[in-house]
Curated annotation (Swiss-Prot):
UniProt xrefs under PANTHER family: CYTIDYLATE KINASE (PTHR21299:SF2), CYTIDYLATE KINASE/PANTOATE-BETA-ALANINE LIGASE (PTHR21299)
CDD domains recorded: CMPK (cd02020)
Protein name per its UniProtKB record: Cytidylate kinase
EC number in record: 2.7.4.25
Cellular component GO terms held in the UniProt record: cytosol
Species: Streptococcus pyogenes serotype M5 (strain Manfredo)
GO biological process: nucleobase-containing small molecule interconversion; pyrimidine nucleotide metabolic process
Keyword Nucleotide-binding annotated: yes
Compartments, record wording: Cytoplasm
Keyword terms, alphabetized: ATP-binding, Cytoplasm, Kinase, Nucleotide-binding, Transferase
Length: 226
């Protein structure tokens, strides 16, 4: 049976990562968290106080402490920078609020996209992000673009933060998500947009299981036809 490449794109908190992880597990595919890679680069910038004028220093740190993924005992994914476990650190609000400017840096995107394509070559992979279907994997056999209302996405982020023990204000989250949408869709390099051949799916009011079922059925149909 042929293993395909699946690209899932969409704005912040549209359910991309949650859905991608479940589908990867169900299909026996590899899940590559591209967002965690950009968050890791952002974490480096913030930890060292680097600005957008010091891209070379961020890249140098990425080379010294490469991003890697490992599995925890419970099956969840751990993110490492070198030997440092940054799984929780990269989900903090300061990283979330700064990831747009770091991910917009052409040199950072070029390096991380190169790594992502190399990993995806063999197929049997599912990636989520903001430019997977348009830039990273334009040859993906299945491209999905998830959308949802700002209200619903803020609610999801609020619940996620509670589960992780991170304090947050609901109204502030709404403002931050709306601001992130604007930044991501208006940046010069790889702006957030659906690929021309992507299936657009509004997840507002749809359960995670419903989204998973929709995407998985599409994937299985493509595999059966190939």
């Amino acid at each position: 049976m042929k293993a395909i490449k699946i690209a899932i794109d969409g704005p912040a908190s549209s359910g991309k990562s949650t859905v991608a992880k479940i589908i990867a597990k169900n299909l026996g595919y590899t899940y590559l968290d591209t967002g965690a890679m950009y968050r890791s680069a952002t974490y480096i910038a913030l930890t060292h106080g680097y600005t957008d004028k010091e891209v070379a220093l961020i890249l140098e740190e990425l080379e010294k402490n490469p991003i890697s993924f490992k599995k925890a005992k419970d099956g969840s994914q751990l993110v490492f920078l070198g030997d440092e476990d940054v799984t929780l650190a990269i989900r903090q609000n300061d990283v979330t609020n700064n990831v747009s400017w770091v991910s917009a840096l052409p040199e950072i995107r070029e390096e991380l996209v190169h790594q992502q394509r190399r990993i995806a070559q063999a197929g049997g992979i599912i990636m989520d992000g903001r430019d997977i279907g348009t830039v990273v994997l334009p040859d993906a056999e299945l491209k999905i673009f998830l959308v949802a209302s700002v209200e619903e996405r803020a609610e999801r982020r609020y619940k996620e933060n509670l589960e992780k023990g991170i304090e947050s204000d609901f109204e502030t989250l709404k403002e931050e998500i709306a601001a992130r949408d604007y930044k991501d869709s208006h940046r010069k390099v790889s702006p957030l947009k659906a690929a021309e051949d992507a299936l657009i799916f509004d997840t507002t009011g749809v359960s995670i299981d419903g989204v998973v079922q929709f995407i998985q059925e599409k994937a299985e149909k493509i595999v059966d036809m190939s």
